[in-house]
A protein has these predicted regions:
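Helix-biased detector of long, well-ordered alpha-helical tracts
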Residues: 1-227
Length: 227
């Protein structure tokens, strides 16, 4: 309860109601927490996955994949000793930082289950555009890279619980990233790619050696939710 109060205050959220449930003895291991959020639409702000436009910069608000990697190592006995912690963080302050620079932002999405890669494919399909990523620009901790390398995982498809994916006109991108670097949870924000007219509905990655490869579309079993 103390942790929830602390985080709610940090995020500027009021907890206004609550109830309890009754479960059979031995049927519950831990605490169930279910929330419903009610908020306000910001005046002058319109964002949607359908609004991505060719020429937009693709931004992430920090290094990716840490939460999914952390949960995977905690749940499975791989015998891997890696220094990885979750990226879990409240995001409203990060959104406010973005909108303090400009309200001309086309997409703001959290990259939870399925990670950044799933979000990018959803946006590419919704907006009928292509997305080209620069592999060298994608921020991934070395420990996460190491775990992914050993297990054959793609960091772009690991869940994040404290990261945003932002699509904004290219002329605003550097200013947005500079502002994010001042934030508590977005010091590793980076421009990782751009929206294109080519290959609508697809995400292409330019590798470190300059080759272009198609990011495999999402498939298979995603890491289960914790709920």
């Amino acid at each position: 309860a103390a942790a929830m109060e602390k985080t709610a205050k940090e995020a500027g959220v009021k907890i206004v109601a609550g109830d309890t449930k009754v479960a059979g003895k031995g049927q519950v291991d831990g605490v169930f927490i279910t929330t419903t959020g009610i908020g306000e639409i910001q005046e002058g702000v319109e964002t949607s996955g359908f609004m991505a436009k060719p020429g937009d910069a693709v931004i992430v608000s920090g290094d990716i994949g840490r939460h999914g990697c952390t949960i995977l190592l905690a749940r499975e006995d791989f015998g891997i000793d890696a220094d990885v912690t979750s990226d879990c963080a409240p995001l409203w302050g990060t959104v406010q930082d973005i909108l303090s620079v400009t309200k001309d932002v086309h997409v703001i999405r959290d990259a939870t289950r399925g990670g950044v890669g799933t979000v990018l494919y959803e946006i590419a399909e919704q907006s009928h555009t292509g997305i080209r990523l620069n592999a060298e620009a994608i921020p991934v901790q070395e420990s996460v890279k190491g775990v992914c390398g050993m297990l054959g995982l793609e960091p772009l498809y690991l869940a994040c619980e404290g990261r945003l994916v932002i699509f904004a006109p290219k002329e605003n991108a550097e200013a947005i990233v500079a502002k994010l670097h001042e934030g508590k949870y977005s010091t590793e924000a980076a421009i990782i790619g751009e929206v294109t007219e080519e290959m609508p509905g697809r995400v292409v990655v330019t590798t470190e050696i300059g080759a272009e490869t198609l990011l495999p579309p999402p498939g298979g079993e995603l890491l289960p939710r914790i709920c």
